[in-house]
């Protein structure tokens, strides 16, 4: 496919996405790639993100190029509440001076059934329009770390070693028998079963992970991995997250996660 054909295919995929989810009764939203920001309203995490954002000042006003749709929509709907419970979007995101096209969905005040239906529809779009399918799925939950590791041990060094899966370092700091070390020693496909030995069966994170595992099995996805190493990109990500890796285009990953800040939601996004 030459450059012109790739450009046409990309634009067609964007349009097809909007048509598909408009037909499924999602509200279509279109926000400017340029965000107008108020320094007084930016929190510590917002300021930390500025390192990857392109921003400038004009007449005492700060402007920045969009780097995250979920964050932009959450910020906007916190100021201007919407009655919509499910929205669909397409557009550019710019991170570290690199631009990409993203398509995605947001479910507000989400129920499990609505989120799973959104994921099901998203995968159907991938199959029909992108001619691809999900090869394997990664599940995780941002409450797992607190369930497995005492707060006093959640130091930057230890968190970094968990993220890097540095077993030798973790053994030194935590011990060989520590639950995190024992879980990470297992194949990621087995870790969800191993997890049951280290946290109560009625722990909300484990219950939710098991519900999703059963649902994914019913959809025909058997290759499911657990990730206990991921740490939330923003503090409002407090629940389950999912990554659906593609069979044909291995660079593409459909990602999603639950968040609760000024608004509660579950977002799903794919970079084309």
From Swiss-Prot:
GO terms for molecular function: catalytic activity, acting on a protein; transferase activity. It comes from the Bacteria. GO terms for cellular component: cytoplasm. Keywords: Amino-acid biosynthesis, Cytoplasm, Histidine biosynthesis. One of its GO terms (biological process) is L-histidine biosynthetic process. The keyword tRNA processing does not apply. It is found in: Cytoplasm. Pfam families: tRNA-synt_His. Pathway: Amino-acid biosynthesis; L-histidine biosynthesis; L-histidine from 5-phospho-alpha-D-ribose 1-diphosphate: step 1/9. Heteromultimer composed of HisG and HisZ subunits. This function is generally fulfilled by the C-terminal part of HisG, which is missing in some bacteria such as this one. NCBIfam families: PRK12294.1. Required for the first step of histidine biosynthesis. May allow the feedback regulation of ATP phosphoribosyltransferase activity by histidine. Belongs to the class-II aminoacyl-tRNA synthetase family. HisZ subfamily. This is ATP phosphoribosyltransferase regulatory subunit. The lineage of its organism: Bacteria, Bacillati, Bacillota, Bacilli, Bacillales.
């Amino acid at each position: 496919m030459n450059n012109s054909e790739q450009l046409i295919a990309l634009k067609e995929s964007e349009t097809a996405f909007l048509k598909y989810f408009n037909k499924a009764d999602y509200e279509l939203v279109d926000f400017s790639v340029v965000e107008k920001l108020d320094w007084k309203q930016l929190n510590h995490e917002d300021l930390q993100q500025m390192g990857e954002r392109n921003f400038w000042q004009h007449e005492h006003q700060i402007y920045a190029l969009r780097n995250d749709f979920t964050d932009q929509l959450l910020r906007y709907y916190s100021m201007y509440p919407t009655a919509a419970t499910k929205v669909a979007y397409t557009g550019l995101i710019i991170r570290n001076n690199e631009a990409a096209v993203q398509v995605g969905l947001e479910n507000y005040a989400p129920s499990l059934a609505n989120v799973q239906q959104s994921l099901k529809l998203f995968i159907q779009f991938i199959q029909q329009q992108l001619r691809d399918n999900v090869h394997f799925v990664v599940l995780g939950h941002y409450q797992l770390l607190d369930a497995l590791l005492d707060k006093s041990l959640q130091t930057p060094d230890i968190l970094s070693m968990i993220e890097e899966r540095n077993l030798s370092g973790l053994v030194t700091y935590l011990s060989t028998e520590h639950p995190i070390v024992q879980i990470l020693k297992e194949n990621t496909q087995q870790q969800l079963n191993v997890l049951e030995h280290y946290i109560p069966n009625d722990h909300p994170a484990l219950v939710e992970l098991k519900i999703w595992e059963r649902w994914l099995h019913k959809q025909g996805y058997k290759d499911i991995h657990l990730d206990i190493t991921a740490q939330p990109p923003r503090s409002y990500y407090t629940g389950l997250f999912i990554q659906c890796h593609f069979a044909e285009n291995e660079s593409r990953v459909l990602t999603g996660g639950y968040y609760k800040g000024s608004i509660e939601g579950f977002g799903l996004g794919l970079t084309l």
